[in-house]
Structure formats: structure tokens, C-alpha cells
Amino acid sequence: STLAAVLAGNEKFTVTEGSAEFLGRDLLSMPIEDRARLGLFLGFQYPVEIPGVTMANFMKLAVNEQRKFRGEEPLSAAEFLKLMREKSAVVELSSKLTSRAVNEGFSGGEKKKNEIFQMAMLDPKLAILDETDSGLDIDALRIVATGVTKLHRADNATVVITHYQRLLDYIVPDVVHVLYKGRIIHSGDKSLALRLEKEGYDWLINEYDR
């Protein structure tokens, strides 16, 4: 979660050493909004509510800001509504929710689906999903995971931060990394996640701390 927050530009954190590049740019020197415009997306563990701002207005502004950054014309109302219908179908998000204030009164599962809907609308180059599976029942987990899988292409990437293997019942990762004390201490394929689910993390941590 700390890594995700730092990459996204959370001002609570100060980077004292090291660097981070994204698409050939110095990420750490960029303001939050430019990181988003460039194609970095962060899905929150606990999505916030924004009373008074409808999902439709929120997403139209966000999408057109990205288009402006790329030198593209803004979407017309008809084009935007068509895009919103297409992307909401990816995560089975009810059209009733897109007309309501952002996350206001949404269930936990609806908030997480809404995060993936936003990801679909913004089409980021790099999406970081922080504990997206937290608090989801099995049906919501399946829908969210299926949405993430559908959005994966050769020209984008998704980092999924999780402590549980169950999400990987639906998402097959290209690489699994174990982050401990600020460092990647082990990497592997899905079999590593299965082993961690079965044996826990102690064998890795003990080896690292030795």
C-alpha cells in the first residue's frame, strides 16, 4: 500500500532516496494529476465517497482531461454515454449507480466494481490495485477479477496488491513478487502464490532475515 501511494503521488510520503520512471519520465517529480493524465491509475483499498458529484460527471471530466493531455478532442455527450455503457458492462455495473454520487451509499462490492469501471473508462497504461479483493464476497470477487482480466492487453500492465491467493483463482498473474521491508525478496509465477497460501510467508522471511 505504501508503494502504491508513493507511485500515485500521495503527499503524506516523502521519498528520501531512489527513483521511479514511468514511460521514460521521472515519475517522482510529477504532480499527482500529471501522473494520472500520463496513464497511472490507483484503485483504492477503501474507495472514498464524493457527495454531490455524479459518477457520470466525474468520469466525463476525467476522461476528457486525459484526452486534452494527449491533444485529442473531448468526447461529445453521445460518445461519452456510449463509452460509459460499454465499460459498465465489463463489470456488470448498474446504470442506476452511474447516475448517483461517486460511491455514495454503494455497498463494498459496488465500490470495488466502480473502481474497475473507472479503470476501464480511463484505460491506463499502468493500474495499481491495492487490496481490491478486500471485503468482497465470492460473486463480487469474480466480477471484479473478470473485469481486470478483460482489460489486460499487451500495451498495458496491472499491479495487483493482495495478501490472499483467492483472487488468483480468477486472475492468472504473469509474475508474483513478494515485497518485504521495502524490497522484493522473491519472485515467481502463480505457483509461488499457491505455495504462500499453503505454507505462509515464514519460510521466506526467515531466509531473508538470516
Residue ranges and their predicted role:
Residues I128-T132, D139:
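Walker B catalytic motif
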Residues L38, L42-Y46, G52-K68, F80-L83:
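Q-loop/switch helix immediately C-terminal to the Walker
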Residues D155-H163:
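Conserved H-loop
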Residues M119-A120:
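ABC ATPase C-loop
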Residues T16-R25:
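Conserved ABC transporter NBD signature motif
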Residues A8:
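Helix-to-loop junction immediately C-terminal to a conserved catalytic motif
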Residues L141-A154:
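Helical segment within the ABC ATPase nucleotide-binding domain
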Residues V175, L179, R183-N206:
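Conserved beta-strand-loop-alpha-helix hinge in the C-terminal portion
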